[in-house]
C-alpha cells in the first residue's frame, strides 16, 4: 500500500484506468475521490497484533451473540483459532444521513458488467468501491444472486499492483433459519430494526470462508454494523463444514480486515454522490 503524501492529506495510490474506462461518465468516482488508509484508531488496533483467541467468537457460537443490544467482548480485531482456521470481526457505523436505498441500488449496479467495456478488462463499477484490490464482480446468472456471485479481488492492499491477478471466488447466500437462527430470534431482531445475513465463499483453489453481516440502529444515531468472517468454514444442507485446506495466517487476516475497513469508509464517501449522478 503506497501512500501519496506531501501537500495533501495522505491517501493511497491507485492503479491507472485504461482509456476506455476513463471515457465512462462515472470514471470520476474512481479518479476524483481519494482512497484513505484506516483512521489512526483503527490502525493502532491493527498494529497491536491479533486479539486474544479467547475473545474471538468460536464457530460453534457464531449466531449466539446476535441481539438488539450489547456487544461481543472485542468488536474489531483478528486472530488465528486453535483449529487452524481464521477469524476477524469488524465494527463500523454509518451516519444518520445514510440511505439504505443507495447500497441496494449499488449492489445490483456493480454486478452488471458495463456494456461499454469488453470482457477481461474488469468492472469499473466494482473498482470504484476499492480501487487497490477490486477487479471484477457479477451475478452468475446475469440477473440476481440466486445462483451465486462471482468476483475477483486481491485482498493484499495493492501489494501485487494488479488486481486482475486476484483469486476468483463465488459467494452463496444462505437462509439462517436453516443454520440455527430460531424464528423467535429472527422476529426479535426484525422488530428492533436489526438486519442479519450470511453467505459462504468458495475460492478457485483451496479455500472456503463463512461470512456473517449484522447491523442495527446505533445509539448515537445512524446504524452500526458488526461483520464477522470464519476462514476455513462453509455451509451446506444446514451444517457448518470445516475446510482444513483453506490457506490463512495472521498476515492474511490483518490484510482482509484492513481491506474491508478501507473500502467501507470509501463507499460511504463515494456512494451518495454516485447514486445521485446515476439516478438524478
Predicted feature residues:
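Hydrophobic ligand-binding cavity/cleft-lining segments
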Residues: 2-145
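Beta-strand/loop substructures that line and gate deep hydrophobic ligand-binding cavities in soluble
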Residues: 4-19, 59, 188-258
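Short beta-strand element of the conserved SAM-dependent methyltransferase core
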Residues: 92-98, 153-156, 197-200, 214-215
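A very general structural signal that marks isolated residues within well-ordered alpha-helical segments
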Residues: 111-112, 266, 273
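Structured surface interface patches that mediate subunit assembly and partner/cofactor docking
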Residues: 121, 126-137, 181, 230-235, ...
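Glycine-rich portal/gate segments that line the openings of hydrophobic small-molecule binding cavities
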Residues: 126-206
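Short, highly charged C-terminal tails/helix-capping segments
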Residues: 269-280
Amino acid at each position: 500500500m503506497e501512500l501519496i503524501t506531501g501537500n495533501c492529506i495522505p491517501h493511497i495510490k491507485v492503479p491507472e484506468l485504461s482509456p476506455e474506462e476513463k471515457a465512462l461518465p462515472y470514471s470520476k468516482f474512481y479518479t476524483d475521490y481519494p482512497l484513505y488508509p484506516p483512521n489512526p484508531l483503527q490502525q493502532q488496533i491493527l498494529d497491536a497484533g491479533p486479539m486474544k483467541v479467547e475473545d474471538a467468537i468460536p464457530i460453534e457460537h457464531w449466531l449466539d451473540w446476535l441481539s438488539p443490544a450489547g456487544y461481543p467482548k472485542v468488536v474489531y480485531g483478528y486472530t488465528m483459532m486453535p483449529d487452524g482456521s481464521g477469524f476477524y470481526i469488524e465494527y463500523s457505523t454509518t451516519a444518520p444521513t445514510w440511505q439504505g436505498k443507495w447500497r441496494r441500488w449499488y449492489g445490483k449496479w456493480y454486478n452488471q458488467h458495463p456494456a461499454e467495456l469488453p470482457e477481461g478488462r474488469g468492472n469499473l463499477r466494482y473498482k470504484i468501491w476499492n480501487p487497490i484490490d477490486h477487479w471484477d464482480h457479477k451475478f452468475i446468472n446475469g440477473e440476481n444472486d440466486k445462483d451465486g456471485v462471482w468476483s475477483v479481488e486481491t485482498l493484499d492492499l495493492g501489494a501485487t499492483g494488479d488486481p486482475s491477478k486476484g483469486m476468483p471466488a463465488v459467494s452463496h447466500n444462505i437462509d439462517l433459519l436453516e443454520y440455527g437462527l430460531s424464528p423467535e430470534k429472527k422476529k426479535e431482531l426484525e422488530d428492533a430494526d436489526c438486519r442479519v445475513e450470511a453467505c459462504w465463499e468458495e475460492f478457485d483453489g483451496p479455500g472456503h470462508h463463512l461470512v456473517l453481516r449484522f447491523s442495527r440502529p446505533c445509539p448515537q444515531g445512524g446504524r452500526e454494523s458488526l461483520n464477522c468472517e470464519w476462514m476455513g468454514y462453509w455451509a451446506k444442507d444446514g451444517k457448518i463444514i470445516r475446510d482444513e485446506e483453506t490457506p490463512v495466517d495472521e498476515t492474511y487476516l490483518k490484510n482482509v480486515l484492513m481491506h474491508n475497513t478501507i473500502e467501507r469508509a470509501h463507499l460511504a464517501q463515494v456512494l451518495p454522490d454516485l447514486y445521485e449522478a446515476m439516478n438524478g
